[in-house]
Amino acid sequence: FLSENKVVKGTSDAKRIETIGMKIKTASERFLTANGKSDYLNDYKWEYNLVDSKEINAWCMPGGKIVFYTGILPVCKDDAGIAAVMGHEVAHALANHGQQRMSAGLIQQVGAVGAALAAEKYAPKYQNEAMQAYGAASTVGGMLPFSRAHESEADMIGLTLMAIAGYDPINAVKVWERMSAQSEGK
């Protein structure tokens, strides 16, 4: 991804991402240690990247590679806003959400194969309908609640990381409100 996109380096915004990232990293180390998980510290090789894109997004890969798009910076508005988004994304990594999502997706795919084989054998005439029903049910019943639970957990851990790093968590609410307004086109 990074080799295919323009990574911003040396600018004041790139330096802010790095500086705030280091504060959140230190906060995450304190958080893991306080929760008896200091053995996980070596699992993360934190890296902070700013990519030149108008897209309003940020994400963290398992292992700690964080990507912020320049388009999210106006929504973040200030360092506390960046810390809110950074804390949330780091929380996904700490809670191992990426790996869990991949595992859940694999389970969903295996289930789809089983459903396809069963439909082919027992109801070949309705195989397409059976697969559509399976897809909808597994998404609504399995993947969406899973995603909502992950987002809630990342919100809680992210607020904690933000506070440990010295930022007022109330700023997170303001960022999420601005983010919501952006997505609604306001």
Placement of each model-derived feature along the sequence:
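Metalloprotease/metallohydrolase-associated module, dominated by Zn2+-dependent proteases
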Residues: 122-171
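A general structural motif at alpha-helix termini
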Residues: 86, 137, 158, 176-180
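Long, well-structured alpha-helical subdomains associated
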Residues: 168-186
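Charged/polar positions on well-ordered alpha helices
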Residues: 23, 93, 156-160, 174
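Peri-catalytic and regulatory segments of divalent metal-dependent proteins
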Residues: 1-110, 118-122, 164-165, 182-185
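Short hydrophobic/aromatic-rich motifs at helix boundaries and adjacent loops
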Residues: 54, 129-132, 178
